[in-house]
């Protein structure tokens, strides 16, 4: 199947979405060269999918130039550049037309296969008679420092998100299928300004049959994942060792995730059984080294795992596969995200069982299998186990089904004694009781004696006292006895 990116690549600058200032600068540059003026080559710098290569081909088509291109999947060392680019830079094509040389992704020149490539490019640019356009994602790499002095730099920004939907609508119309406007906007928003990625996503959805909103929601966010997609494209398409190993250099994903991506997309790209078998053989060897890294904690083996999974799988094919390939994230990641809720519920059940049985959650998993069988066969025993492990209704349903859950819960409900609710008696409002103040007891008065008797008794006592005093005066030497006191 032909790639829609190539099939619907704009043939003219008028068809290129956005980049008005860049298009005007290219027109002035090419017209001055046609007019006989000497101009430095152009270096278009910008993020992947911004339209750098498309602009180069569009300007060539508008002014009837043939194109010779070298890109990241080609070997670009000193000899190749000298033979291909050097010759084309100073000669006309077989049709008699002038030639535009396009050196794509020059910031990807690295390793032994591209040794001396940058230096040879600078040498060719100095003597080139035909126009040269170079493209780069990261123009500020140290290796391109000397090259920047030999070119005119034009920065190409990302395509605005609002410019992407019209392009997608036009492609859908030409391909003869209808697509919801919401889906088009979702594709555009997920692209992160990468028009090429948006077109690839549209083709991926279209090849899957009917395009649904749910499918569009699963599209990757290109702002964070575009590096891994670029890496997949390079690894699957190239047949050069250094190009393949450098493909994952700037990828933000860890090595284990990259391995999963390669494993998922290998059968999509390698259609020959021999190539596929060779590719998986190298991938399995890479997995062996990764296992040794994790077990021994010796990260020096990491480079062997990386080389086997990238260069090994890239060199496993006999030749490059042409055409469009629908790359996608590993299915295991999608499955894990969908089963996150059920896996969490199982963890909660295992924790409860492990707590009651004094074992680990790993050993508790064996108990779950027995519980499922018991739940389906004996409701009474199941009820006791549910109470013992303190399982909730949702957890029982997770292990069995709703019908069995109802039976177990009904048994539990029947075991519990029904407590009659006593209606509280109406209490009458207590009457107000006045406090009783005890009466103070009366002090009884002594009976009153007659006045005459009192006087007589008083006189007798006074006479007796007087007699006693007289007796004491008469006999002072008389010894005092007790009788005298009475």
From Swiss-Prot:
User: Which family does the record assign?
Assistant: Belongs to the activator 1 small subunits family. RfcL subfamily.
| Disordered: region residues | 419-486
**Species per Swiss-Prot/TrEMBL record:** Methanococcus maripaludis (strain DSM 14266 / JCM 13030 / NBRC 101832 / S2 / LL)
Gene3D superfamilies associated with the record: 1.10.8.60, P-loop containing nucleotide triphosphate hydrolases (3.40.50.300)
The annotated regions of Basic and acidic residues compositional bias extend over 420-432, 442-480
One Pfam short name: AAA
Keywords of the record, alphabetical order, are: ATP-binding, DNA replication, Nucleotide-binding
GO MF term (any one): ATP hydrolysis activity
The record ties this protein, via NCBIfam families, to: PRK04195.1-5, PRK04195.1-6
Protein name (record): Replication factor C large subunit
What CDD domains does the database record attribute to this sequence? AAA, HLD_clamp_RFC
User: How does the record describe its quaternary structure?
Assistant: Heteromultimer composed of small subunits (RfcS) and large subunits (RfcL).
Out of the domains of life, which is the source?
Answer: Archaea
Q: Briefly state the protein's biological role.
A: Part of the RFC clamp loader complex which loads the PCNA sliding clamp onto DNA.
- SUPFAM superfamilies for the chain: P-loop containing nucleoside triphosphate hydrolases
Q: Summarize where ATP binds, as residue positions.
A: 46-53
Residue ranges the record marks as coiled coil: none
Q: What's an example Gene Ontology biological process for this entry?
A: DNA replication
Fetch the InterPro entries from UniProt: AAA+_ATPase, ATPase_AAA_core, P-loop_NTPase, Rep_factor-C_lsu, RFC_lid
């Amino acid at each position: 199947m032909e790639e829609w990116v190539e099939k619907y690549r704009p043939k003219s600058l008028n068809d290129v979405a956005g980049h008005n200032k860049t298009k005007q600068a290219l027109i002035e540059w090419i017209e001055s060269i046609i007019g006989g003026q000497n101009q430095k080559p152009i270096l278009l710098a910008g993020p992947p999918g911004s339209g750098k290569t498309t602009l180069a081909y569009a300007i060539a088509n508008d002014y009837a130039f043939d194109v010779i291109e070298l890109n990241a999947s080609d070997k670009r060392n000193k000899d190749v550049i000298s033979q291909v680019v050097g010759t084309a830079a100073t000669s006309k094509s077989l049709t008699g037309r002038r030639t535009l040389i396009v050196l794509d992704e020059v910031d990807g020149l690295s390793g032994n296969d591209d040794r001396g490539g940058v230096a040879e490019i600078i040498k060719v640019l100095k003597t080139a008679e035909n126009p040269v356009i170079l493209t780069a994602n990261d123009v500020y790499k140290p290796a391109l420092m000397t090259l920047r002095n030999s070119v005119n730099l034009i920065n190409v920004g990302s395509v605005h998100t609002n410019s992407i939907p019209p392009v997608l609508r036009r492609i859908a119309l030409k391909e003869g299928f209808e697509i919801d406007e919401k889906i088009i906007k979702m594709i555009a928003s997920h692209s992160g300004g990468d028009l090429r990625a948006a077109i690839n996503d549209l083709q991926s959805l279209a090849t899957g049959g009917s395009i649904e909103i749910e499918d569009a929601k699963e599209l990757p966010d290109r702002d964070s994942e575009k590096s891994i997609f670029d890496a997949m494209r390079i690894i699957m398409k190239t047949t050069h060792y250094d190009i393949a190993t450098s493909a994952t250099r700037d990828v933000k994903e860890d090595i284990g995730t990259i391995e999963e991506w390669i494993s998922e997309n290998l059968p999509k790209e390698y259609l020959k059984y021999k190539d596929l078998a060779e590719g998986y053989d190298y991938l399995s060897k890479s997995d062996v080294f990764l296992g040794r890294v994790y077990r021994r904690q010796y990260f020096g083996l990491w480079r062997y795992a990386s080389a086997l999974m990238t260069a090994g799988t890239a060199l496993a094919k006999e030749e490059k596969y042409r055409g469009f390939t629908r790359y996608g994230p590993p299915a295991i990641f999608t499955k894990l995200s969908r089963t996150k809720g059920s896996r969490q519920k199982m963890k909660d059940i295992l924790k409860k069982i492990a707590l009651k049985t004094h074992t680990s959650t790993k050993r508790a998993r064996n108990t779950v299998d027995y519980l499922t069988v018991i739940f389906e066969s004996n409701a009474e025993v199941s009820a006791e186990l549910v109470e013992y492990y303190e399982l909730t209704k949702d957890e029982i349903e997770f292990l069995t089904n709703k019908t069995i859950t109802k039976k177990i819960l009904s048994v539990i409900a029947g075991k519990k004694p029904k407590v009659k609710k006593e209606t509280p008696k109406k209490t009458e409002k207590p009457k107000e009781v006045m406090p009783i103040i005890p009466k103070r007891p009366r002090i009884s008065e002594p009976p009153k004696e007659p006045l005459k008797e009192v006087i007589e008794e008083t006189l007798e006592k006074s006479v007796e006292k007087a007699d006693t005093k007289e007796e004491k005066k008469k006999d002072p030497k008389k010894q005092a006895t007790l009788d005298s006191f009475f």
